[in-house]
Amino acid sequence: IPMTNGHFKPLPEHKFSFGLWTVGNRGSDPFGAPVRPHLSPGQIVQLLGEVGAWGVNLHDNDLVPIDATPADRDNIVREFRQACLDNGLVVPMVTTNLFSDPAFKDGAFTANDPAVRAFALQKAMGAMDIGVELGAAILVIWGGREGTETDGCRRADVAIQRLREAVNFLCEYS
């Protein structure tokens, strides 16, 4: 393990990768306001490049605001891809934020409302498209809002069936 002045020095072959949501976290919580300044995705990539990180991961909306126009989305992704190239970083993984929007209060892929399930699929496909453009080989499906109240709002077998259908659909899309 390479050491510099007694400290670990990360090398690209160690493949340290960080999420935009972790490095860019402003330090707010339910009990207080943000305590750190906002960092743009480009600033985060530059910082990660400076410390020797190998990669950067992201949720769709960590990079592209949910209300971005298609042209804005394309510009943002293009500029981010260039920032990664300029700083020697790869994007190994993307995921989709299926938890922040109030639409997902009842789940995303397992929601009772078919319009919410369709919205979740559209967001996931958009995240997959971003991932392809950035060279990511992995899409993470994190079900943070799936099933937390399954017993109270739907049968577990129905939730599992809906999740299976969503994953199968996304596999076909890929």
Predicted regions and their residues:
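Short, conserved phosphate-binding/catalytic loop or strand-edge motifs used
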Residues: 141-147
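N-terminal pre-domain/capping segments
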Residues: 1-137, 157, 161-172
